[in-house]
Amino acid sequence: MGAKQELWEYFMNHTTGRRSLKGAVHGIIAFTMDVDEEITDLILKRLKRSEITFVESSGAYFDFLRKQLHFPYKISPAHRTTALHEMGHAVDFISCERIEKRVNAHSTRTIFKEHYTTGEYVLSSGKTLDKTVREELKANGARIYSELLSRFNREVLDKLGSDVAENYLTVNARLVSDDTAKRKYRVPYQTIASYRENRAKIDAMYALRDSMTLTYDERYNLFESRKTVTKSTEYSQFCDRYDTLIDMISGVENTKYLWPGHSRSYMKRKGGFGVEFFADVFSSTATRNASDLEFVAELLPNSYAGFKEVYDHIKAIA
């Protein structure tokens, strides 16, 4: 059984109802820093009920959680666990990097063995434990997975089901196939956005891509770099309209959706079109090309929660 199959079985065996985390799960879930509000809500509900042990993989994400938990001050790594426990949360915050440092330091090895020798481990960002420590954990009944859900291919996500994918897929995911060299299913993403928006955007992109008559290489480049010069009229027209939209977006200033440094080239490289990038454009669309707005509307399905209002607004303007 491969690592992905094992992880799939793990989530299937430890989920119930809407396939959300079961309270009895004894394990460590490590996320990357770019986790959206929807996933955070899922986590917080369980943190407040002291149901799970949660390990974060970056200080930046903890700061984001700290705001969600309404901590009045910034908590240093050394005080995170204590502070959360005082608030009644059964949570241990420690990054994969610190796990490795701790288990390889003789002075702290005992601490690790006391608290992290059993359970389920999902390591993020490709981090791996020291081989000796890994063997110790396995000897104590631990199951260790180093496969990220964000590295799952599209077929596996479909098998997992939308609820599971929605709950566990990190927002900075780039869906790729097993053969990463081919990058068969790579799609663009935003640095921060909700998974629902990403999912809808992904579906729209696949639908648009699949509706075109393109070669394999053209399909690969369509939403990645778009640097390949093709003979496809449909593809060229799409690129022209996409450039127009990016120009429109790049003129928006002081918007919470555009981080510093989100230049036109950056947004093109990251595939920067989605509801979040258009939300603040609508107030100044009087001079915009109506066909471009219709093009946006075509890319945003109105069947997704949160999209209907935006979709209708685009249609009204167009």
Describe each PLM feature range.
Residues 18-21, 25, 29-41:
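Generic structural signal for alpha-helix starts
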Residues 4-12, 33, 38-318:
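Active-site-flanking segments in enzyme catalytic domains
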Residues 1-2, 6-20, 27:
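Fold-level signature of zinc-dependent metallopeptidase catalytic domains
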